[in-house]
A protein has these predicted regions:
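Cytosolic, long alpha-helical scaffolding segments
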Residues: 1-173
């Protein structure tokens, strides 16, 4: 494979990551809107769409492996490929969170309205910004922004654990 061909395939890889990110931003917007609308059909759609993120992750991982196996990447190429692998794994996990939130939403639709945990909307906004920053970091090779995203991941995990505990407690009552 020539270097030009490699660079073209690397561009395609980065584009696949961007598309997954844009789709995830859209899903996060749907989750946020559905918390107010409490639309069972929309919740089901979000849950079903999680399979698309699973497939995107697998396809992007295949693209990464193909790049590595067909040409020996230089150090900067390895960093970009490794960043893509890490990012798509994180985005897929966020998509899983969106699906989980939608499953909780379906359960809440069946019960009396329940107030959301205090930090819930903050969590979703942080997740959305994290996706946007991740795409920007990889597109612009911005290491500082990438480090910010990594630090933010723990914050999202903590928010999600709080939310899950709160909703589980409420549903058991």
């Amino acid at each position: 494979m020539t270097r030009n061909k490699f660079n073209e395939e690397l561009k395609q890889l980065l584009n696949s990551v961007r598309v997954m990110g844009v789709n995830l931003e859209d899903t996060l917007d749907k989750v946020i809107a559905n918390l107010e609308q409490k639309d069972a059909a929309l919740a089901q759609q979000i849950i079903s769409d999680d399979d698309n993120f699973d497939n995107s992750e697998v396809n992007i991982e295949k693209q990464c492996l193909e790049l590595v196996l067909t040409q020996t990447p230089v150090a900067t190429d390895w960093r970009e490929i490794a960043s893509c692998l890490k990012l798509v794994g994180d985005m897929e996990r966020i998509a899983d969170h969106c699906s989980d939130i939608s499953q909780y939403t379906l359960k809440l639709i069946e019960k009396e309205p329940v107030p959301l945990p205090d930090n819930f909307m903050n969590m979703l906004q942080v997740m959305r910004q994290m996706v946007y920053d991740s795409i920007s970091a990889i597109s612009e090779n911005d290491l500082e922004l990438a480090n910010k995203v990594i630090a933010t991941d723990d914050e999202v995990d903590n928010y999600f654990a709080e939310m899950r505990q709160h909703l589980t407690t409420v549903m058991q009552q």
